Amino acid sequence: KTAEFRIGQLITNESKFTISCPALTDGTQYVYDGSAFEPEVTVTRIEGNKKLVKDSNYSVTYTDNIHAGTATVSVEGLGGYVGVWQKTFAIAPRDLTDSSVELSVGGVTDGSYQTQYTGSPVEPEVELTYDGQKISTTDYTVSYGADHTSRGTVTLTATAKDGTDFTGSRSTTFTITLASIGNGGYTPANGFKIGAIEPQPLVDGTATPQPKLYYNGTELVMGTDYICTYEKNDSIGSDAVVILKGIGNYTGSVKKTFKICANIADAEITVPDELWCECRRDGHCNRR
C-alpha cells in the first residue's frame, strides 16, 4: 500500500509561525444576526516577519458559523506549507428584547389590537420578526395572562425556546372588547340567534316572555349576559316587542316581535241549564 502526503513547513509550529485571529482574543462578541461570521485570520512566518498569502499559502474555512452555538475556524497550509490549525468561537443567541425584534398581534405591533369577546379563550394571530424576517414559530412559545377569555386587556408573551437563535422573552398587550348582540334593530349580530317565542298570554296586564339567546351556538344566561325589556306588550292581538340588551361581556341590543293571545283562564264558559235530544229511528237526533 502507498499513501500520499505533502512535505512542507508546518504552520502549527509555534517556533516558526504565528497564527492570529484577533476577534477571538480581543473580546469580540458575536450575536446571531442571520449572517455568516468569519473572523479574519493571518499566518505569519516569524523569521523575517513575513505574512503568508491567504488562498495561496493557506486556506481558511468556517463551520457552524451562522446560528447560535459553537462555530469553528480552520486554517490549513497550502503549497509548501502543511498542517491544520483550529479554534472555536461562540455565537450568542439574539435577545427578543432587541430593538430589531418585533412582536405583532393581529398584524399590529403597538399593543392596540382589539378583538371581540367570543365566550372562549381568545388567541389571535401572533408573529415574531427579526430585522423584518419572520421567526419560525418552532423557535418560541406564546403564553397569555391569567384571563384571555373575558373582556379587558390581555398580556401576551413570546418566549424563545432553548437551543434556538434567540433567548429571553418579549411581551405586548391586546384588548378583548364587548361582543355586540345587535345594533338596536331586528337583526341579531353575526353569531347571535334568538330562540322562538310562542304566543304569550297577558299576566297581570302584560306579556313578558324571556326568549333564549345564543352566541356561536352557546346559550347565554338571562340576567348575566342579557336582560329583556318590552314595548306594546299589554294588548291582545298586537305585535308586541321584546328588546334583548347585552350586559356583562355583551353590549348592544336586538328586538324581536311576538304575539299576545287571550288567556283561557280569563274565558267565561256557559252551559245551558237543560240540554236533551230526541233520537229518531234513522239514527239522527234532534237537539232541544
Locate the predicted segments by residue.
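Solvent-exposed, low-complexity, repeat-rich "mucin-like" stalks and linkers
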Residues: 4-49, 93-133, 177-218, 263-288
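Serine/threonine-rich, repeat-prone extracellular segments and beta-strand-based repeat modules
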Residues: 1-6, 50-82, 87-89, 133-167, ...
